[in-house]
Structure formats: C-alpha cells, structure tokens
C-alpha cells in the first residue's frame, strides 16, 4: 500500500512539473509574440506618419502658381476604346500648324509619308514636300547641292539649330511638337487649355519678367509664347468656322496623331485580338465540358481473373 501511494505521489509531482514547464514556455512565447506585434504596429504607425507628413509637404508645394492650373477633362472624339481619330480634324490641324505654329515649332519625328492616307492624298503630300529644299549629295567638285523634298523626308523645322532658335525667341527654346501631347501631363486637355487659356490681362499682383506672357495653365504662370490663335486667323479649306477653340481643337488633334500615328491601327488590332481570344476561350469551354470532362472523370475497373482450379 505504501508503495502505491509513493507511485501516485511521484506521478502527480512529475505531471505538475511538466505542466509548469509547458506553461512557462507558452507564457514566454506569448510575451515574445506580443512584443513582435507591438513592434510591428509601432513601425507601421511611424511609416504611415512619415508618409502622411511627406504627402502634406508635397501637397503644399504643388500649388497652381508653381505647377500650373489643372486642365479640365474634355470629351475628345478619339478617347473611347472603339473610337478613332477625326481625320478631317487632322487635316485642319495640319493647316493650323503650317500657317501658325511652324514659324517657331518643329516636327522632327514626323515624315511626309505618314500624312498619306491620313489627312492628304499622295499627290498633295508630294507637292507639299517639294515646296522645301533638302541637302543633297555634293557634286563632283564637292559643292553642296539642294533637291526638292520627297515623301521619305521629315518635315523641316523653322531653325537650323538650337542657337538660332534661341536667338530668334529672346533666349527661349520652342519645343519640338512631335511628342508634345505625350510629354505633358494632361495630354490633349493641357494643350487645348494652354492655347485657349490666355487672359486679356494678368491678375492683379502678378509680376511677369520682360517678354513673358501670363497663362494660368503653364507652370509658374509665365510663358514666353504669346497668344497665337485668334478668331478667323485661318481660312479652312472645308469652310469650317475658324474660331479660336476650333483651331485649338484641330491642332491638338493633329499633334496627338503626330505623337501616336498608330492609334487607329492599334485599336483595330486590339478589337480583332479580343474577338479572336474570346472565340478561343468559348471553344476551350466547349472542349472542356464536352470532350475533356468525360476523359478526366472516367474510371477503370480491373477485375483480376479467377485462378483456375
């Protein structure tokens, strides 16, 4: 009897010791986990506070006076997923560029041949290119020669180099307009707003440097380019009224096409791709349901032959 009591006492002692050890380990593990969670929450809070503070500084710095007034969103006819450029507007926009913008700005990345079939016929573009002279190979004596333009040539700029452009514009460099729509935040909305956003007089208290003009959509509000579009400044070939907004819309559409001449073909190809992939997807569903499902779910039963007696 005494031995039985001793065994029971020993078992209880061991079980209590094991329980206390396990409880202590669990307690330590819980405290460690709690510390890690607390540290993670604190780090996340510090990171969030830092980001919010930096964002507040950026928001204070990004004022309309420094970064320009935000251009409103306009309903451009080519913005939809299935919409294409208004090619009549591209033709009118080229006319505005040639008669107004080409005096200062270039289109170095646009070749004459890209206009064929988009806004002009082959003969029209060929005649326009031949109005300009390009450098040709020198003659036998090494003297430089000139030749009429060809469809493969690029539209020439108004100045031979950057120094000449700055000298003619009081030190300001007119940007190339080939990619201007893609190079400016807001794209077409910004270009249209900039062209039509010149007020008659700058706001009271705004001091402009000599030779500058005020435009709220330009960063800083001071721009070297003066207002260039006025009503009836261009006589459109198709008889469209040449209002300031109409000319700005047309030349913006033309510049958007210059920056993205593959726009229409890209959307056309995208539509074809969606149709083909959708058809293949439906075909795969049919194959899965009516052809592959039976193969995938079938079962083979093997009945071993009975041994012969």
Curated annotation (Swiss-Prot):
Q: Which residues lie on this side of the membrane: Mitochondrial matrix?
A: 297-309
Q: Which residues bind heme c?
A: 101, 104-105, 225
Residue ranges of the region described as Disordered: 131-168
Q: Which family does it belong to?
A: Belongs to the cytochrome c family.
Output a single Gene Ontology CC term carried by this record: respiratory chain complex III
Residue ranges occupied by any Cytochrome c domain in the UniProt entry: 88-241
Q: Which residues lie on this side of the membrane: Mitochondrial intermembrane?
A: 62-262
Q: Where are the transmembrane segments?
A: 263-296
The gene name reads CYT1
Q: Which organism is it from?
A: Saccharomyces cerevisiae (strain ATCC 204508 / S288c) (Baker's yeast)
The organism's superkingdom is given as Eukaryota
Q: Name one GO molecular function term.
A: ubiquinol-cytochrome-c reductase activity
Transit peptide as a keyword? yes
- Write down the Pfam families for this protein, in alphabetical order: Cytochrom_C1 (PF02167)
Q: What does the subunit section of this Swiss-Prot or TrEMBL entry state? A: Component of the ubiquinol-cytochrome c oxidoreductase (cytochrome b-c1 complex, complex III, CIII), a multisubunit enzyme composed of 10 subunits. The complex is composed of 3 respiratory subunits cytochrome b (COB), cytochrome c1 (CYT1) and Rieske protein (RIP1), 2 core protein subunits COR1 and QCR2, and 5 low-molecular weight protein subunits QCR6, QCR7, QCR8, QCR9 and QCR10.
- Quote the annotated effect of residue 272 to A: Loss of RIP1 from the bc1 complex
Impact of mutating residue 296 to L? Loss of CYT1 and COB from the bc1 complex
**Main location as per UniProt:** mitochondrion
One further remark on this entry is:
Present with 39900 molecules/cell in log phase SD medium.
Question: According to the record, how does the cofactor bind?
Answer: Binds 1 heme c group covalently per subunit.
From the UniProt record, give one GO term of the biological process aspect: mitochondrial electron transport, ubiquinol to cytochrome c
Transit peptide feature range:
1-61
Write out the function statement from the record.
Component of the ubiquinol-cytochrome c oxidoreductase, a multisubunit transmembrane complex that is part of the mitochondrial electron transport chain which drives oxidative phosphorylation.
- What's the protein here called? Cytochrome c1, heme protein, mitochondrial
List where in the cell it is found: Mitochondrion inner membrane
Q: Which reaction does it catalyse?
A: a quinol + 2 Fe(III)-[cytochrome c](out) = a quinone + 2 Fe(II)-[cytochrome c](out) + 2 H(+)(out)
Q: What is its EC number?
A: 7.1.1.8
């Amino acid at each position: 009897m005494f031995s039985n009591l001793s065994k029971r006492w020993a078992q209880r002692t061991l079980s209590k010791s094991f329980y206390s050890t396990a409880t202590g380990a669990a307690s330590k593990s819980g405290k460690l986990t709690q510390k890690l969670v607390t540290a993670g929450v604190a780090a996340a809070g510090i990171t969030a506070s830092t980001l919010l503070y930096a964002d507040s500084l950026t928001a204070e710095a990004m004022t309309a006076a420094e970064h320009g007034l935000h251009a409103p969103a306009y309903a451009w006819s080519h913005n939809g997923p299935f919409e294409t450029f208004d090619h009549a507007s591209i033709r009118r926009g080229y006319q505005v560029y040639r008669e107004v913008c080409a005096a200062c700005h270039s289109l170095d990345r646009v070749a004459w041949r890209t206009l064929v079939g988009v806004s002009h016929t082959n003969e029209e573009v060929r005649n326009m290119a031949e109005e300009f002279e390009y450098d040709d190979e020198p003659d036998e004596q090494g003297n430089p020669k000139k030749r009429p333009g060809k469809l493969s040539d690029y539209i020439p700029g108004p100045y031979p180099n950057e120094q000449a452009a700055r000298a003619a514009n009081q030190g300001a460099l007119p940007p190339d307009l080939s990619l201007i729509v893609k190079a400016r935040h807001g794209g077409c909305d910004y270009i249209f707003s900039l062209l039509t956003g010149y007020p008659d007089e700058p706001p009271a208290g705004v001091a402009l440097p000599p030779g500058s003009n005020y435009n709220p959509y330009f960063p800083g509000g001071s721009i070297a380019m003066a207002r260039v579009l006025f009503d009836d400044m261009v006589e459109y070939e198709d008889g469209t009224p040449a209002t300031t907004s109409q000319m700005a819309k047309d030349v913006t559409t033309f510049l958007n096409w210059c920056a993205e001449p593959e726009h229409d073909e890209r959307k056309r190809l995208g539509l074809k791709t969606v149709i083909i992939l959708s058809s293949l997807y439906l075909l795969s569903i049919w194959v899965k349901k009516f052809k592959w499902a039976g193969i995938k779910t079938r079962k083979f039963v093997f009945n071993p032959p009975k041994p012969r007696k």
